Amino acid sequence: VPSAMTLATFLCLAALACAGEKVLLDFGEGFDFGKVPTTDARVCEAKREGGSALHVETGHRAEWPGITLKAPKGKWDLSPFEFLALDAKNVGANKVTLCCRVDNPGADGVRNCVTGRLTLKPGESGTLKVELRRKPRSAARNKLFGMRGYPGEPGGDEGAIDAAGVTQLLIFVPRPKEAHAFEVAAIRVGGAYTPPPPKPDEERAFFPFIDTFGQYIHRDWPGKTHSVEELKARLAAEAKELEERPGPPDWDKWGGWAAGPTLKATGFFRVEKLDGKWWLVDPDGHLFWSHGTDCVRENDTTPIEGRETWWQDFPGERPEFAEFFSKGHALHGHYAGRTVRSYGFGQANAKRKYGDDWRARIADLAHRRLRSWGMNTIANWSDPAVYLMRRTPYVATIHFQSRPLEGSQGYWGKFRDVFDPEFNKKLRERLAQEAGKSAGDPWCIGYFVDNEIAWGDEVSLAIAALASPPDQAAKNAFIADLKAKYGAIEKLNAAWGTSHASWDALLASRAAPDKKRAWDDLAAFYTRFAEEYFRLIRDAVKEVAPNQLYLGCRFAWVNDRAARAAAKFCDVVSYNLYRRSVADFRYPGPDKPLIIGEFHFGALDRGMFHTGLVPVKDQAERAAAYKAYVQGALRHPQFVGTHWFKYSDEPTTGRVLDEENYQIGLVDCCDTPYPETIAALREVGHTMYRYRLDAW
């Protein structure tokens, strides 16, 4: 029931704010509160003096509890307006962050939508405003595709919409830990949008826009490569620098702290807690903190199909660079679902810079660079030809395919069915390939198995099992659990509010039960599913490589139930944490060592079109952000390492897999290090052991 507070002032503010604006949706007479779609929420009318508001109470079982407000006639045309706004009041007992997302068809939280947010203390009112950021549509832009970001337009199509085709609004609380209550007054739009003037000669002047090195033509910046001679000069300068600065003098051969405490040496990497802080311990018994970078390998390739006018002096037209054509499968974006022809500008640049033996030379250089830069780990998705040189400790990457859980969904694909015998079989077949390579290798810290898989909320995988076909192994396992608990289908029906005629009827059904009524059973099976996942992998890893660590699955989107399951079986639990700081990160499970598998920062001052997931203003701010992030992890008692994503920038025109074209490398597409970032790496890496030991 809504609180008894008076809304008069609240609604008066809304009315004043509406001056010169248009009400898009109000909650007065005729609004059907009972037909508002909800996710872990309930709604009702808050009828007070001065008008009505929408009262919303949210739970904390879903990742994004809230409501959906659909356009009454299928879509709203908001093209005349600059923003959407709503007035909200926190009527709950807890501080709340409210989000309002404006959607086009196909909105996924990143593309085809724009989002605004507002944080309110208990009793506080405020206005949540969402800028109706348009998808860029200049004459040249209409000819561009297949990238996350576009020239001169930070973020490109991400966080942008077609304002003429808005289909719905989502009002939600992101990943709450407690229940919330809030009220929303009339939703309105305002501001007169003025489209940019057309530039009739723009297209002719714009193309081609990528030079022979894969760089943006229409801009210059510090460090841009203008000739092969510049590449050679930078190579010579870097060789001198690496000779003068070979690496921290107090490290042992592994990158552990030779000058620090000596613990038990086992000949392999392990974990130990010392004076309240978790550490890795290197094979010689020295403290080791994993400071590394992902993707130490050849650069990603970029699609070239349909882009013939984009390139100036395209290297692929020369016989000596024709070897860098390839084909790749696209998972997301313009080329999604297709195998497309692509080209490796980075490889062509490496051949120009290092000669015909470029692969061997860049592999050798990677080890020398990392040591000099204060890094001691070759991290995920790196080239075995590089890390099996056994000069820098590394982690190995394990991926495999088995039958999916058909009712599941996720950004990178469906979850696999851990109860299907094929899961364990394919896992062990893949790990067997590491025999004689990483398995038993003292330089191998351990294994990441999988990456950013879709854990959903605390019951999602149980619901996915029920939504799967009758021959799904997980579904049969779940129903067996229910039979053991309830015995008769009638007892299950009474508990869940269902009307299945028999257990076979439940097996045949693909309908999801009422979440609230079935919660305890759904949560119990989710726990069983998650623990089975981690147990099977732990057992397989330890059978093939008993001396290597199981480093988990690199959580990106995870609930507490899955995180606690990981703690039971992983030696180290891994997270990909894209944020400014991890100093205050709180793990929901028991005291376990943690490792960061991915993080990055990017800017638009070096010719790239997208900042990546955590934007910064420029390279100076990028360096400062790097230092602050890693030192925050060093102060945290549970973190035993941070791995930057990634070694090289992504292609200017987007990688094949998913169109990413982020400025997130330690080196650019011409293999030129970013000096500001490298200086930050050195500052942090060369002092990290004393810094961590002395922290609190």
Name each model-derived stretch.
Residues 464-477, 645-696:
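Aromatic-rich peripheral "rim/lid" segments of glycoside hydrolase catalytic domains that contact
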Residues 59-160, 165, 178-183:
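Extracellular ligand-binding interfaces
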Residues 442-446, 450-452, 599, 614-666, ...:
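Substrate-binding cleft of secreted/luminal carbohydrate-active enzymes
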Residues 44-66:
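Short carbohydrate-recognition loop motifs
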Residues 283, 293, 301, 307-358, ...:
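Polysaccharide-binding and catalytic clefts of secreted carbohydrate-active enzymes
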Residues 342-350, 406-416, 508-523, 556, ...:
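Active-site clefts of carbohydrate-active enzymes
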Residues 213-388, 405-440, 515, 520-528:
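Active-site-adjacent substrate/metal-binding segments within catalytic domains
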Residues 524, 528-612, 627-634:
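Glycoside hydrolase catalytic-domain groove-lining segments
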